[in-house]
Each structure stands twice: as C-alpha cells, then as structure tokens.
Curated annotation (Swiss-Prot):
Name this protein carries in UniProt: Antifungal protein 1
UniProt source species: Arachis hypogaea (Peanut)
Described function: Strong antifungal activity against fungal phytopathogens.
A Gene Ontology biological process term: defense response to fungus
Any single GO CC term annotated in Swiss-Prot or TrEMBL for this entry: extracellular region
Domain of life: Eukaryota
Transmembrane intervals: none
Localization (cell): Secreted
C-alpha cells in the first residue's frame, strides 16, 4: 500500500 493509495482511500470514506 503506497502513500497515494492510502491518501485516496482516506479521502474516499465510503461507509
């Protein structure tokens, strides 16, 4: 898991 993926996942908070 790279930084970009993490940031994107963090930004897209889908419940």
């Amino acid at each position: 898991l790279d930084s970009l993926s993490f940031s994107y996942n963090n930004f897209e908070e889908d419940d």
